[in-house]
Regions:
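Acidic catalytic loop of the alpha/beta-hydrolase fold
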Residues: 232-236, 262
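Catalytic histidine-centered segment of alpha/beta-hydrolase-like enzymes
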Residues: 256-270
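Flexible "cap/lid" loop of the alpha/beta hydrolase fold
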Residues: 126, 130-166
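Active-site loop/oxyanion-hole signature of alpha/beta-hydrolase fold enzymes
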Residues: 76-116, 272
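Conserved alpha/beta-hydrolase catalytic His-Asp/Glu region
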Residues: 151-152, 166-219
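Short beta-strand/loop motif that positions the catalytic acidic residue
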Residues: 221, 227-229
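Gly/Ala-rich beta-loop-alpha elbow adjacent to hydrolase catalytic centers
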Residues: 117-121, 125
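Conserved HGGG/HGGXW glycine-rich cap/lid loop of the alpha/beta-hydrolase fold
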Residues: 39-85
C-alpha cells in the first residue's frame, strides 16, 4: 500500500534554460511504425517524459518542463493521438501507451529517469507502466481516473454533439478556458488547438478517459510513483487516487485539499521536480 501525506506548496515556473524547442514529425513510414510527435526542451543528462491532459497539448506541461530543464533534465513532451499536431487519430489508451513504450525504446534507451502524466496523460503513463514495469525510475501520476464511469461514457457522444459546433466561437472557448482554470497566457494555444481536434477524436478520447480501468499489472510496477489528487476534484477522482495507491506497492499518495483537477501540472511545477528528485 502506498504512503500518504499532505502538502500545500506553491511556486512559479523557472524561466531559466528555456532553450530551443525541438519538434519531431514522422516521415513516410508504414502505419504500424508511426511515431509520436514530440517536443523536446533542455539538454540535461537525465530524461523526463510528460504526457498532457485530454483536449490540451504539450504546452500543458510547459511550466514543469522549464523547471526540469533548468535542473538538468532533457524533457520530452509527446502529443497524444487525436490532439492538435498529432500524427494519427485517437484509438485507445492502450495503443497510445504502446506507442510511448516504442518511442522510449527507439529514442531514449528503453528507460527514462522520470515519467509524468495528468488526466488522460496519466492514464497513458499508467498503461505504459503496466506494459513495461521498469520503463521509468520515478513517476508522477496526477488526477488519474481508474474507476470506470459508465453513465458518463454514455453521455459523451450527445454532449459533444451539442458543444462541438460552438468550439470555434470566442465566447464559448473563453468559458471553457475559464472552467479549466488554466494560466491566462495559455489561452491562445488552448483556443487554437481545441479548434483543431476533430469531433470523432474528441468523442473517442473522452470515452476512453471515462472507461479506463486499473490494471492488475501495476502491482509489479518498478517505478517509485507519486500519486497526486486535488481535494476540489470530484470524489471519484479521490477514490481513484486512493485505489491506485493501494495497487502500487512503492507509491506515495499526496492529497492537496484546495487543489483542482490537474492543478499541479499548471500551477505547481515544483511538485514534479520534488517527486522526480525523491524529495519529501
Amino acid at each position: 500500500m502506498g504512503r500518504t501525506g499532505r502538502e500545500e506548496p506553491r511556486a512559479h515556473a523557472s524561466a531559466q534554460a528555456r532553450g530551443s524547442l525541438q519538434r519531431r514529425r514522422p516521415g513516410n513510414v508504414p502505419v504500424e511504425r508511426i511515431q509520436m510527435v514530440t517536443h523536446t526542451l533542455g539538454t540535461g543528462a537525465r530524461t523526463a517524459v510528460l504526457l498532457h491532459g485530454g483536449g490540451l497539448s504539450w504546452w500543458n506541461y510547459r511550466a514543469v518542463a522549464d523547471l526540469l530543464a533548468a535542473n538538468g533534465y532533457r524533457v520530452v513532451l509527446p502529443v497524444l493521438d487525436g490532439h492538435a499536431g498529432s500524427d494519427r487519430p485517437f484509438t485507445s489508451i492502450e495503443e497510445n501507451a504502446s506507442e510511448l513504450v516504442a518511442l522510449i525504446d527507439r529514442e531514449l534507451g528503453g528507460r527514462v529517469d522520470a515519467l509524468g502524466g495528468v488526466s488522460l496523460g496519466a492514464q497513458v503513463a499508467l498503461e505504459a507502466l503496466a506494459q513495461r514495469s521498469r520503463i521509468a525510475g520515478r513517476a508522477v501520476i496526477e488526477s488519474a481516473l481508474v474507476l470506470p464511469m459508465r453513465a458518463a461514457r454514455a453521455l459523451v457522444a450527445p454532449a459533444v454533439a451539442l458543444s462541438y459546433p460552438l468550439v470555434r466561437r470566442p465566447w464559448f472557448s473563453q468559458a471553457q478556458f475559464a472552467s479549466l482554470h488554466l494560466p491566462e497566457e495559455l489561452y491562445e494555444p488552448y483556443h487554437r488547438d481545441s479548434c483543431a481536434i476533430s469531433k470523432r477524436d474528441m468523442i473517442a478520447f473522452m470515452r476512453e478517459n471515462s472507461s479506463y480501468r486499473l490494471k492488475p499489472e501495476l502491482a509489479g510496477c518498478g517505478a517509485r510513483a507519486t500519486i497526486l489528487v486535488g481535494g476540489k476534484e470530484p470524489r471519484i477522482m479521490v477514490r481513484s487516487a486512493r485505489a491506485l495507491a493501494k495497487a502500487m506497492p512503492d507509491s506515495t499518495l499526496v492529497e492537496h485539499p484546495g487543489w483542482r483537477h490537474g492543478e499541479a501540472s499548471l500551477w505547481h511545477p515544483e511538485v514534479y521536480l520534488e517527486a522526480f528528485e525523491g524529495r519529501p
